[in-house]
Amino acid sequence: MSQEAGHSFFDAMKDKGIIAGTVVLSKHGHDAGRIYVVVAEHESFLSLSDGDKRTLDTPKRKRRKHVCPLGQMEKATEWLTSLKELPVPQQSSELRKAIRNFMDGHRGPVTS
């Protein structure tokens, strides 16, 4: 988990809230328990992708209050930008790898 200038993930959450690159757990709905990456943020909604049922092309739109933040991916902004430049099948594959890697405790996208 990245910590800039003595700030923890929780300090960043207090300052900015859930932002793009945050890994979240769905708390409510038919997808409860599913892990997503926030790919875009709106006032009260988030756009979520998991690389499986929800790709970058068709993100899930979910209310902020219906997700629980798990952590922030390192260099998330740069990673999401480079991810969007890949072909769709590769985007999904890289997104799934990054979520799996994050959940295994590495906190960032897998580099080849």
Regions found by a protein language model. Give the residues of each.
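Short, charged beta-turn/beta-strand-edge "cap" motif at the junction between a beta-strand
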Residues: 29-32
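Ferredoxin-like alpha/beta domains used as RNA- or RNAP-binding modules
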Residues: 2-20, 27, 37-112
